[in-house]
Amino acid sequence: MALTTYDELKTSVADFLNRDDLTSVIPDFITLAETSLNRTLRHWRMEKRANAVADTQYTALPSDYLEMIRLSIIDSTTSTIENVGQFEISKLRAQNNNTTGKPVNFTILDGSIELNPTPDAAYDVQLLYYGKIPPLNAQTTSNWVLENYPDAYLYGSLLHTAPYLQED
């Protein structure tokens, strides 16, 4: 049994279930497996870098963002910006009278990176983060998870069939 492409995965799920009436929903089971993997898996192949210019209090996160590893200002002294909680950043901002300057803290808020203090100039920043697994579909027929861990996709997809088939 080959299990190296999206179509082969869909066929394998149908074969394991011994059902030919689920063809239209098998892609949903695969998507649910990917969602579960994105929530729990942290692998070096998920590590991504993104560069941005931070010149306002808020900077958008990459669309495939899952979790921050590190945020750094890239200049002559490359410095890491400390990750603090949302309450803590509000407290720090109030203590410093909402001043501007070179950011030293950040938090994640509403799909953005909130910097403190608010940048007083345009700073080049580099995000090191965990990104989502590239989703399988008709155009993207394989990815590193399917190539290296096909059992994770197969088992995850089959696991999500149980509620649908009322076998949970």
Q: Which residues fall in each region the model found?
A:
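Glycine-enriched, solvent-exposed interface loops adjoining structured elements
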Residues: 1-168
